[in-house]
Amino acid sequence: LLIAPCMPLRGAGELPNILFILADDLGYGDVGCYNPESKIPTPNLDRLAAQGILFTDAHSPSTVCTPTRYSVLTGRMAFRTGMRGVFTGAGGPCMIEKGRLTLGGMLQGRGYETALFGKWHVGMTFFDKQGKAINKNGLEAVRRIDYSRAIPDAPIHRGFDHFFGSVCCPTTDWLYAFIDGDRIPVPPTGIIDRGPLPKHAYSRDNRPGMIAPGYSMEEIDLQFLDKSLAFLDAHAKKKQKAPFFLFHSTQA
């Protein structure tokens, strides 16, 4: 259903732009169009739903981040990852092997400009100073990363022209730094101080990893949003425009 609008019937007009929002940890009953008694007002989503399609009998083969994203990006069943959990820290390599067609890559083939802003979470390969792939979780793995090296299986090598985001969950996993394209322009320099973070039931979900200067836990989703809005603004100003596919991937 997501791809159908991109394949116009013979004689149809221009290819449509596509905005795909992956709302991590959004419950079925959290949106007003599905649950009038929802505690969170969602007027914009409700308006979109009124003009589109409501899925009332949809089922997920996986309820966690990594397998879900793998399925969305590849069109394959989540069980094919062989992984029921999620990547953390410098975990990798990318589950989407080189040469596998992705949603972004397919749309690139149709002339789309493709962008992904937000959480990737299907693995990336980081290297140490000797050029050895790390592909492990934990603080020591993050400490070993050589940040001068490019990431060979970042999203820009898997079907996306633009990427800004995080390798894993940006507020709970060991590597608290942003990736721009296939590099980390501002590497982490110290251990995260969890003291100033808001106190709630999941306060200790933040693993004691390495954090980059200026990396604000409270502003993560807003930074992803700024990148998506800037991409849309830049696209609107172009005189010669290809259609765009924007994958906005929120954090958990």
Features from the language model and the residues they span:
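Bacterial N-terminal signal peptides
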Residues: 1-5
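Formylglycine-dependent sulfatase
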Residues: 7-252
